[in-house]
Amino acid sequence: MGRVKKNKNKSAYYAVIIIIIIILAFAVYQNRGTLRALNGSSEVFSYESGQNFSFDTQNGNVVAIGSDGAQCFSDKGIRKWNVIRRFVNPRMQNEGDFNLFYEKGNKEVYLYSDGSKIWEYVSDQPIITAKINAKGYAAVVSYETGYRAKIEIIDGLGSLLYKWQLSEDYVIDADVSPDCKQFAAATVSPNDANVTSRVTVVDIDGEKITGETLLAAVGSDKLVCISPRGEMQWAVDFEEKQLQKFKLGYNTSHILTFEGSRNNSILEIYGKDGKKTGEYISGEEIKDIDINGATIAVLEKQELSLISLKGAVMSETELKKDVKKVMLLPKNRIAAVGSSSVEIIKP
């Protein structure tokens, strides 16, 4: 009889262990989108998400958006805010303290700040793209019946400020100036002979343009700088080199990568005056680039490098995982983005 009682106790003990394991497994599954602290490594933290996630940086933080909404984490892995909203094909654009969320093909666009909704705007037709500036003004590009595209400028309160319907040109991109007085539109106009691309600067309030904000734009054969009056300030000709990637810096340098002769890439760095300041030749084709102040991040197949504006290598980090995108954070920390995860790396 005593042995039977002992076996019963042992069976109960094992049952409790199994229940605990199931609970722990369920907890891990429920928190599969949270952060893991990694010790003894150059990785500061890792964030694993579900499918269809995209990542961006904002004020030194990492913002992730997916089908369940958006989240913001500090570079130490601390969650700062969370927006719960159902998305199918989400897009986001971050500037200053603002986050602009929308779905390509839907009509709604949302502006948030620190996880709180500021305004919501509904366009008449499906949205193609949208941009926000640091004051909460947005440029929303959408389709339009009877036209090729429409650009709507939305102010910081969510009200329609300006509308431009285009009958001859397709709109590739649009952006509002930092002072909210002008917006720039990149358009293409196809005809029987060729396709013409142009950048148009529009004065929103009709006042005389007094600002000196310059606009940088990349075409198929050159990098150009244009004044708000549409005057060419400088141009960099690509001289038949094959452009691979580019990153236009805000109040800093511009970087371009071209196809090399050994299945590699050549990165060229240009200052705000259009003068070349440096060059970096990679061992393999460059997958992605980013710039923050005086530091440039270069992603190759299995290596991540930080270089200066003169092209000098500052640090190199060997990658053990597949990284598709890099984003520079303060203190030269790097957000390395995979298919559905992001890791903050300190070289």
Regions found by a protein language model. Name each.
Residues 37-47, 52-63:
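An edge-strand/N-cap motif at the start of beta-rich repeat modules
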Residues 12-30:
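Hydrophobic membrane-insertion alpha-helices, especially the h-region
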Residues 48-57, 86-97, 125-134, 168-178, ...:
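Repeated scaffold domains used in trafficking and secretory/extracellular systems
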Residues 25-46, 67-84, 106-122, 149-165, ...:
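Surface-exposed loop/turn elements that mediate protein-protein interactions on large endomembrane-trafficking
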Residues 62, 99, 137-139, 180-184, ...:
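Hydrophobic beta-strand positions that form the internal "hydrophobic ladder"
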Residues 250-258, 269:
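Anionic-ligand-binding alpha/beta catalytic cores of soluble enzymes and soluble regulatory domains
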Residues 92-194:
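Non-cytosolic head/periplasmic domains of membrane-anchored proteins
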Residues 1-11:
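N-terminal Lys/Arg-rich, disordered targeting/topogenic segments
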